[in-house]
Design a protein with these regions (language model features):
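Conserved ATP-binding/catalytic segment of the ANL
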Residues: 421-481, 616
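Structural core segment of the AMP-binding/adenylate-forming
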Residues: 2-15, 122-193
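Gly/Ser/Thr-rich phosphate-binding loop
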Residues: 287-289, 307, 315-319, 329-400, ...
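Conserved structural elements of the adenylate-forming
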Residues: 81-87, 196-203, 212, 231-257
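Conserved pre-ATP/AMP-binding loop-to-beta segment of ANL
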Residues: 57-60, 179, 185-189, 193-220, ...
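Conserved AMP-binding A3 loop
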Residues: 73-78, 207-210, 216-243
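Conserved AMP-binding/adenylation subdomain of ANL enzymes
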Residues: 239-264, 271-319, 325-336
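Conserved AMP-binding/adenylate-forming core of the ANL superfamily
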Residues: 37, 58, 62-114, 134-144, ...
Length: 619
């Protein structure tokens, strides 16, 4: 937006204004608590499903594209109740229960949703596993670790053949295995066979025993700091997050709110993480929404599917990673029909997983103004597998980078840690502790019972805390240069990546105990493919062009950074992609800064070698 330009108003966000209480303790610790009380919430998620099925049995609940025809297939709330009752009975017959989970190896689908909800109905924890552990791994070590941790009674893989090797790597002889497709093995049953099971009173009896302490899922941490850790996610934790959001809800604030409009949610985020499963999917059930399963992803090969799906459903809310929003902005700037479809019902845009750049924020607002005449609220929620959602931006923010303020029911404890404020949290959505990990649990909870996230935050304005909190990096990722100057990786890294967009996929910052900071970057696959095409297939020439371009952007970044803690003096382009087996990257696309630096110590040494090594660029 041009400086001094008068901007149109926001579409009003249907949420209450910030109202928090801040208490200071001895030693500089700050406690932050919202004054709003939690709102309504369901008894459990399965109870919520059954209630919605009774209220509107014929309303579309799930929509998923048939991979063969490309046509949308619809499952109603009433059908979902019937199917989950039948599957729940089948799981009981197979011996599933509170101590015998149901493991899901395949990704988001209507059938996977039914399996997850059916398991919860009988108190059997659902354990959705990151798909790359089965399909992208070569040693299956993380998959075997997850299997050994939860000891499932039942395993589901939608298509058996792609998962055959992964399942064979498990000690699964005692497990019941089923798939949507005939597997050619007598021991593997079909999904349709289980759906044909006649439910008995045992399902209702098991469901009646569910309470806040019932474990709904085992969600595994992303493995970005070692092997994935199993997090018991209770019904109480999931429903408390719904209650926290309801405590902020104020539909009357939006004069255009139509209570008869069925919300449309379009989402690709994997259900083995809280954002896709506990925030978006559970929230859709609570709101009686229609959940469109997005078969696209923010990659050059798959994002067109997301664009096509937006045209079909005109979602009322849309949340994704900033990289996907950048791709969407590119598409909408070139296509007014897509622009109109996207903003037709849109009430807010959400993002997470990385910082949204000022440039992308401005582009999205310009598109919103073009389509609607107003700006759109762009919000985010901050949390972790262990805590569910902790904070949310619940007002029309004029800036990016905020993580918001705590949800009703949650209390933040901000503890001085060097020059930063380390964030800790307590509340009903925080896990009771990792499964069978007493030593680890003793490490992650402090003396007051607050969970320690390892992140740092800062106030936008400490004199006006209602303006919100800003993410200030990981406490353990920051390092000192030889001069004693601290380098804040958590802010430098995303700022550099944003400045170099769209050339790079990600970057890591090196320099601990060195005289200066340096950077290693991964090229964007789409950009490199374009450079190779321009170079007539000459990959070496394409790499030189890329290196020259990224060096130019890096020098421009340095020009605006006067301090040594923010200036990068050398650059190396990485050719080996981040390894999921080694834990360098998760299925969410999060790159583990510390692990990459440790695993590629030889490259770090090369960056700092004298004279300048081949491939290293002096900035």
């Amino acid at each position: 937006m041009a400086e001094g330009q008068t901007l149109p108003p926001f579409r009003l966000l249907p949420m209450k204004a910030p109202d928090i209480e801040m208490t200071r303790a001895e030693g500089g610790t700050i406690y932050v608590t919202p004054r709003q009380a939690p709102g309504d919430r369901p008894k459990t998620v399965p109870h919520c499903l059954d209630e919605r099925a009774a209220e509107h049995p014929d309303r579309p609940f799930l929509r998923e594209k048939d991979p063969a025809t490309g046509e949308w297939q619809t499952l109603t709330y009433g059908e979902a109740k019937s199917i989950t009752d039948s599957l729940a009975q089948a799981f009981l017959d197979m011996g599933a229960g509170p101590d015998a989970p149901v493991m899901i190896l395949s990704g988001n689908s209507t059938r996977a949703a039914m399996v997850i909800l059916a398991a919860q109905k009988i108190g059997a924890p659902a354990a959705p596993i990151s798909v790359p552990y089965s399909l992208m791994s070569t040693d299956y070590e993380k998959l075997k670790h997850c299997f050994a941790a939860v000891k499932p009674a039942v395993i589901f893989a939608e298509q058996y053949e792609p998962f055959r090797k992964a399942i064979s790597a498990l000690n699964s002889d005692a497990c019941h295995i089923f798939s949507a497709e005939p597997a050619g093995e007598n021991s593997v049953r079909t999904y349709d066979d289980l759906v044909a099971t006649e439910p008995t009173d045992a399902v209702a009896s098991a469901m009646a025993k569910l309470d806040d302490g019932s474990i709904a899922k085992y969600l595994f941490t992303s493995g970005s700091t070692g092997m994935p850790k199993p997090v018991p996610t209770t019904q109480g934790a999931m429903c408390a997050m719904i209650g926290g959001q309801e405590g902020l809800r104020d539909d009357a604030r939006d004069p255009e709110y139509d209570p008869d409009l069925i919300p449309n949610v379009l989402d690709w985020l994997p259900w083995n993480h809280i954002s896709g499963s506990n925030v978006n999917f559970n929230g859709a059930i609570w709101n009686g929404a229609t959940f469109w399963i997005d078969d696209g992803k923010p990659t050059p090969a798959l994002f067109q599917r997301t664009i096509d799906n937006i045209r079909d459903c005109s979602p009322s809310s849309f949340g994704t990673a900033p990289i996907a929003l950048a791709m969407l902005a590119d598409a909408m700037e070139a296509d007014d029909t897509l622009l109109a479809a996207f903003f037709k019902n849109m009430r807010s845009i959400g993002y997470g997983g990385a910082t949204l750049s000022d440039d992308l924020y401005d582009r999205l607002q310009a598109l919103a103004i073009k389509a609607t005449g107003r700006r759109i609220p762009i919000i985010t929620m901050y949390g972790a597998t262990e805590t569910q959602g902790i904070t949310v931006v619940h007002w029309e923010a004029e800036r990016v980078g905020l993580i918001g303020l705590p949800l009703p029911g949650m209390t933040l404890k901000l503890v001085p840690n060097g020059a930063k404020l380390e964030v800790r949290v307590k509340g009903p959505s925080v896990m009771p502790g990792y499964l069978n990990s007493p030593a680890k649990n003793a490490e992650v909870f402090d003396e007051e019972g607050y969970y320690c996230l390892g992140d740092a935050v800062t106030f936008v304005d400490e004199n006006h805390p209602e303006k919100g909190l800003v993410f200030d990096g990981r406490v353990g990722e920051d390092f000192k240069l030889s001069s004693g100057t601290w380098v804040s990786v958590g802010t430098l890294r995303p700022d550099f990546v944003a400045a170099c967009s769209p050339l790079i996929f990600d970057a890591v910052i090196a320099g601990q105990d060195k005289d200066y900071a340096a950077v290693m970057v991964w090229p964007s696959q789409a950009v490199m493919e374009q450079y190779v095409k321009i170079a007539g297939g000459d990959k070496a020439r394409a790499m030189k062009t890329f290196t020259d371009e990224i060096a130019h952007k890096a020098r421009a970044f340095n020009a605006g950074e006067p301090g040594s803690s923010r200036r990068l003096k050398r650059l190396l382009v990485l050719t080996e992609p981040p390894s999921i087996d080694a834990g360098e990257i998760t299925d969410k696309g999060y790159v583990n800064q510390r692990l990459v630096i440790d695993r590629r110590a030889d490259l770090v040494s090369r960056i700092y070698s004298e004279p300048l090594a081949d491939g290293v660029v002096q900035l």
